[in-house]
Design a protein with these regions (language model features):
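C-terminal substrate-recognition "lid" of short-chain dehydrogenase/reductases
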Residues: 2, 80, 118, 222-253, ...
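Conserved glycine-rich cofactor-binding loop
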Residues: 7, 14-16
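Short, small/polar-rich loop/turn modules that mediate ligand/substrate recognition or access, typified
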Residues: 87, 173, 178, 246-248
Length: 259
C-alpha cells in the first residue's frame, strides 16, 4: 500500500476528482478526512470508503470562512493523531467575463481557489513538520499554466496557486515538506458542466451542457475528457513517497492540451 498509515485531508471531496482521490487514497492505506460543503456528499463518500474497509471521517465545512479552513486540520489531527498530507482541491470557476464583472463572484473565486488554500496550509504546516515532513498538493488547472480567454479570472487565481506552491516548495523543503500542483485539463465532473455553461458566457447560452462538455474535451489531442480516477492516480503519485524528490512541480494531466 502506497499510503499505509498516512493521514490526510482532501477538500472538495464530495464528488468528482476530489472524491476519486479520497477513495483511492483510502484504498492505498491512508486515513482520510473527506471535506466538502455538501454534507450529503460527505456522508456518501465516507460510506463508500468505509464499506470497502477504509478509514475516513467526514467534515462538512464552508472554507470561505478562515476558521473552518483551520478547523478541518485540527479535527483531522485530533481524530487520527497527526497529519501527513493535504490535497487542497477546492475550486470555483468564477466569472467568465471581465466586462461587467460580478465582483461578488470574483471574490468567491479568490476565496475558494486561493485564500482558503493558503489558510489551510498555514494550519497544516505545523502538523506536517511535527511528523518530520509530508506532502501538500494543490489543484490548479491548465488555465494556471496558460491563459484562458474564456476564464481570465480563473486563470489569474490558478496562476496564483501555482506561484504560491512553487514559492512555498522552496521555503519548506528543509522541513521535509514537499509541495506540488496538479493541473487537470477538461475532466468529466459536475464542475466541468458548471464551467462550460456559466450564465455570463454569452457564447454558451441556450446550448446543451453535454454538447459543450464534448466540444471542450474534444479540443485536446486525445479527444476526450479525463476521468476523475485519472486525476486521482496522478495525485496519488505526487502525494506518495514515490515522488520523494519531486517538489515545486506543476504537473499537467490534460491529454496533451499544454504540450
Amino acid at each position: 500500500m502506497r499510503l499505509k498509515d498516512k493521514i490526510g485531508i482532501v477538500t472538495a471531496a464530495g464528488s468528482g476528482m476530489g472524491r476519486a482521490g479520497a477513495v483511492r487514497f483510502a484504498k492505498e492505506g491512508a486515513k482520510v478526512a473527506v471535506v466538502d460543503l455538501d454534507g450529503a456528499r460527505v456522508d456518501s463518500a465516507v460510506k463508500e470508503i468505509t464499506a470497502a474497509g477504509g478509514k475516513a471521517i467526514g467534515i462538512t465545512a464552508d472554507l470561505r470562512e478562515d476558521a473552518n479552513a483551520r478547523r478541518i486540520v485540527r479535527e483531522t489531527a485530533n481524530e487520527f493523531g497527526g497529519l501527513d498530507f493535504v490535497w487542497n482541491h477546492l475550486g470555483h470557476p468564477g466569472p467568465a467575463s471581465v466586462e461587467g464583472i460580478d465582483m461578488a463572484d470574483f471574490a468567491l473565486a479568490v476565496d475558494l481557489n486561493l485564500r482558503s488554500q493558503i489558510v489551510t496550509t498555514e494550519a497544516a504546516l505545523p502538523e506536517l513538520k511535527a511528523r518530520g515532513g509530508g506532502s501538500l498538493l494543490y489543484t490548479a488547472s491548465t488555465s494556471g499554466l496558460q491563459g484562458s480567454q474564456f476564464s481570465p479570472v480563473y486563470s489569474a487565481v490558478k496562476f496564483g496557486v501555482v506561484g504560491f506552491a512553487r514559492a512555498l516548495a522552496k521555503r519548506v523543503a528543509k522541513d521535509g515538506v514537499r509541495v506540488n500542483v496538479i493541473c487537470p485539463g477538461a475532466t468529466d465532473t459536475p464542475m466541468l458542466r458548471v464551467f462550460v455553461a456559466r450564465p455570463d458566457q454569452q457564447s454558451t447560452q441556450g446550448r446543451d451542457p453535454e454538447e459543450l462538455v464534448a466540444q471542450r474535451a474534444g479540443q485536446n489531442p486525445m479527444g476526450r475528457p479525463a476521468r476523475p480516477e485519472e486525476i486521482a492516480n496522478a495525485a496519488l503519485f505526487l502525494i506518495s513517497d514515490e515522488a520523494s524528490f519531486i517538489t515545486g512541480a506543476a504537473l499537467p494531466v490534460d491529454g496533451g492540451t499544454t504540450a
